[in-house]
Amino acid sequence: MKRIAIVVCCCLTTTACVDRLEPPLPPSHRQIEQVQDWAHKRSGPYDIPETALRAYAYAAWAVAKQKNCNLGWPTLAALGESLSNHGRAHDSRLDNDGTTTVPLRGLNLFDPAHPQEVADTDAGYFDGDPTKDIPIGPLQIMPSRWEQFNAAVETDAKPNPDNINDASLTLAGFLCSVGDPGTPDGWANGVQQINANPEFVKHVHAIAKKYSR
């Protein structure tokens, strides 16, 4: 991945109101050297694969620069943990370029007893299931959403839903499209688009808050 400088200039605000969860954002930094160096230093303490952490940080930086969208990497990291354990579900891992070694399909790790039923939109083209849509990749993006928002970090490459770099950039773009994730309502609305269960939203918020410290 191209080495870049990343600036994170957001702070974390908390509230006692359960129904109004403040967006978890990283603490202020004047300058976070470069994504790779930054991720290398924090991968161990956060227990996030360095490749995944780099992907989350780059995606947050990219949407901030290109879309003026105040997402923050902790939200992407919290979703990555909740949806696939950062690409490590089902004995998978991320290879050197960020692609999972096992195709991750329909994981539903948060509530496996109640999988989402979604009508088919892609005839199995992305998810391999011609009967219904199932979420794909390390960030469990629905096929219809992937088709609309897919983005590749490398501009000359085809976006790959099984690659955490492309998946992070795609999910970041989607979250920015449904509201301002730098506000409580915008943040909650974005996460609800992934899983409308209020407990899931609170779960993601708690993890993102942990990463924000």
Predicted regions and their residues:
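Polar low-complexity intrinsically disordered regions
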Residues: 1-2, 204
